[in-house]
C-alpha cells in the first residue's frame, strides 16, 4: 500500500526534492503501468498527472510522443536565461511637472499628441504611454480611497446627510451661469442633525 501511495502522489517529498536529496527505499515493488481498469477516471487522472508533471521532475525527460518540445534548460531555481527587464525610468522633475500638467487637462492622449509630448520631453513614446496608464490607475485608486473615506465618515454620523464630495461622472462639468444664486447653498433645512 505504501508503494501505491508513492506512485500516485507527484507531490511527495521524493518527487519534489529529487532522488539525490531523499534516500531510496530498499526495494519497492513496481506497479504495472495499467491498472485493473485502464478506462477508470482514476487511471486517466494519474496518466494526465504523470504527463503534466513529467517535465517538472528533475530526473524525468519529456517523451517525444507527447507532442511537446523538450525544454532547452532544465527547470529549477536560477535555470534558464531570462530576458532582462528594462530598468525603471527616472523622470526628471521637469518631465513629471509637464506630464502632470497635461494629465490635469487630458487623461487620454491622441497618438499625435502623445508623439509631440514625448518629443518635447525627450522621452520615448512608450514611456509616455506607460506614464499615463500608471497615472490613470493612481487616480482611480485615489478616487476610490476618497469615496471610501467619505462613506466611512457618513457611517460615523448617521444623523447628518452626506452629499458626495466627489464629482459624479453623470453630472455636467459646467454648472451653468455663475452668480450668487448659482452656487449650492446649504441651509438649516438641508442638514438634519439629531439633537
Swiss-Prot record:
Q: What induces it?
A: By PAX3 which regulates its expression.
SMART domains in UniProt: HOX (SM00389)
Q: Which UniProt keywords apply?
A: DNA-binding, Homeobox, Nucleus, Transcription, Transcription regulation
- What is the protein name given in its UniProt record? Transcription factor LBX2
Q: Which organism is it from?
A: Mus musculus
Tissue specificity here reads: Expressed in the developing urogenital system, eye and brain.
Q: Does the keyword Repressor apply?
A: no
Q: What is the lineage of its organism?
A: Eukaryota, Metazoa, Chordata, Craniata, Vertebrata
Q: Which residue ranges hold the DNA-binding region?
A: 84-143
Q: Where in the cell is it found?
A: Nucleus
Q: What happens when the gene is disrupted?
A: Mice are healthy and fertile and do not display any abnormal phenotype.
Acidic residues biased stretches:
186-195
In terms of superkingdom, the source organism counts as Eukaryota
SUPFAM superfamilies, per the entry: Homeodomain-like
- Keyword check for DNA-binding, yes or no: yes
MF terms in GO: sequence-specific double-stranded DNA binding
* GO terms classed as biological process: muscle cell differentiation; positive regulation of convergent extension involved in gastrulation; positive regulation of non-canonical Wnt signaling pathway
Give the GO cellular component terms, alphabetically: nucleus
Amino acid at each position: 500500500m505504501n508503494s501505491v501511495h508513492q506512485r500516485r502522489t507527484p507531490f511527495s517529498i521524493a518527487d519534489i526534492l529529487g532522488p539525490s536529496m531523499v534516500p531510496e527505499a530498499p526495494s519497492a515493488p513496481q506497479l504495472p503501468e495499467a491498472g485493473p481498469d485502464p478506462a477508470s477516471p482514476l487511471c486517466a487522472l494519474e496518466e494526465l498527472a504523470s504527463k503534466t508533471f513529467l517535465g517538472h521532475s528533475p530526473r524525468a525527460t519529456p517523451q517525444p510522443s507527447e507532442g511537446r518540445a523538450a525544454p532547452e534548460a532544465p527547470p529549477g531555481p536560477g535555470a534558464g536565461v531570462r530576458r532582462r527587464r528594462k530598468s525603471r525610468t527616472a523622470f526628471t522633475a521637469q518631465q513629471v511637472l509637464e506630464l502632470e500638467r497635461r494629465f490635469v487637462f487630458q487623461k487620454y492622449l491622441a497618438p499625435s499628441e502623445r508623439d509631440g509630448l514625448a518629443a518635447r520631453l525627450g522621452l520615448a513614446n512608450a514611456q509616455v504611454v506607460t506614464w499615463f496608464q500608471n497615472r490613470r490607475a493612481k487616480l482611480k485608486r485615489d478616487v476610490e480611497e476618497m469615496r471610501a473615506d467619505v462613506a466611512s465618515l457618513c457611517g460615523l454620523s448617521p444623523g447628518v446627510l452626506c452629499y458626495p464630495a466627489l464629482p459624479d461622472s453623470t453630472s455636467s462639468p459646467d454648472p451653468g451661469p455663475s452668480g450668487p444664486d448659482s452656487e449650492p447653498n446649504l441651509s438649516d433645512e438641508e442638514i438634519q442633525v439629531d439633537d
